Amino acid sequence: APLGLSLGKKCGRCSTRYCGPECQVQHWQEGGHDQLCKTIKKAGGAEQYNANKKYAEAVTVASEACAEDTKDQTCYICTQALHWKTKEGLVRGCSCRGTAGVVHVSCLVEQAKILVAEGEENNLDYEAMQPRWDRWTQCSLCEQSYHSVVRCALGWACWKTFVGRPEMDPTRQLALCLLGKGLSAGGHYEDALVVQEAELATGRRVGTSENANHMLTVKSNLAKTYQSLDRSEEALSLRQEVYSRTLKLHGKEHGRTLQAASNYVSSLIGLKRFQQAKKLLRKSIPAARRVLGE
């Protein structure tokens, strides 16, 4: 059942919310809450506790997966083989070659946290903040996106960092988005689906317009996850909506519209709806040529 947001039953000690008193009793008696309650409270609540736990697990998975590739090497940030505090191993999940790009997830996280905090302190606008946020997803050396288990660990790290902020805080919403994409990159599509559906529900609950770029991005990411789970009809429906709204919002020659059209065509072709795909391509290809050239 859905968790209560403000009126639901909650634990008097750690404030974990439940859908009702029966759910709370069951969790205490059978779910182990009696053993976890103090730990959850100390962590800062159920969401923070879960984020901390999942992050630690993801870092372990990433460092173990990268152990052979990073053997006898050191972190390019702290210059150590083992992290001085967490004792975690090294990872490399970008496009760096040779010995470049070897690093601790914790070092990447600290770097990203500092950059975002500095940007917020100086009230930087969206355009100036973007390169700082990129540190949660892209290598600063090769400037390519992290992938697989490393991207997944960074997604949990970002969510762990900002989960305590108010639900309407754009930073928290962006962190949730990066968590969903990180889970997808790690192949955890069912988990990504839960996160992205929650992200969409949160946007609607706080009154974000369905035509807002943020909501269109959320729906586009959700459609990609549906596609990964072989839920092609649902992916098609969302991509059709995203394309229609983006076209009205930005016009046919905007980069967002061209990308939305490409995603929509991909779904149509996947479902063998070739005539519809051909019709859309006849509209979008001339626009793409005008914007991007041959």
Residues covered by each model-derived region:
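Short linker/helix segments within small regulatory modules
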Residues: 5-15, 26-32, 90, 94-99, ...
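Cysteine-rich, disulfide-stabilized extracellular repeat modules
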Residues: 7-10, 14-15, 19, 33, ...
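Cys/His-coordinated zinc-finger cores
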Residues: 15-36, 99-117
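Generic structural microfeature
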Residues: 18, 32, 70-73, 102-103, ...
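Intrinsic-disorder-linked linear interaction elements in eukaryotic regulatory proteins
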Residues: 43-65, 80-84, 100, 105-294
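Cys/His-rich, Zn2+-coordinating zinc-finger modules
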Residues: 3-6, 21-49
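Small Cys/His zinc-coordinating "RING-like" fingers
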Residues: 1-10, 18, 66-94, 141-153
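Secreted/extracellular small peptides and ectodomain modules produced from precursors
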Residues: 35, 92-94, 229, 271
